[in-house]
Amino acid sequence: SCSCKRNFLCC
């Protein structure tokens, strides 16, 4: 899963 807090590319 993606998390914006960890990886801004997922936002």
From Swiss-Prot:
Where, by tissue, is this protein expressed?
A: Expressed by the venom duct.
**Residue(s) carrying Cysteine amide:** C11
The record's subcellular location field reads: Secreted
MF terms (GO), sorted A to Z: toxin activity
Superkingdom to which the source organism belongs = Eukaryota
Q: Which UniProt keywords apply?
A: Amidation, Disulfide bond, Neurotoxin, Secreted, Toxin
Between which residues do disulfide bridges form? C2-C10, C4-C11
PTM note: Pc16a is the amidated form, whereas Pc16b is the non-amidated form.
| Entry GO terms, CC | extracellular region
- Keyword field contains Disulfide bond: yes
Give additional notes from the record: Negative results: the native peptide has no effect on nicotinic acetylcholine receptor (nAChR) subtypes human alpha-4-beta-2/CHRNA4-CHRNB2 and chicken alpha-7/CHRNA7. The synthetic peptide has no effect on a wide range of mammalian and insect voltage-gated sodium channels and voltage-gated potassium channels.
Describe the task this protein carries out. Answer: Potential neurotoxin. No target has been identified for this peptide.
Q: What is known of its domains?
A: The cysteine framework is XVI (C-C-CC).
Q: Please identify the protein, giving its name as recorded.
A: Conotoxin pc16a
Q: Native species of this protein? A: Conus pictus
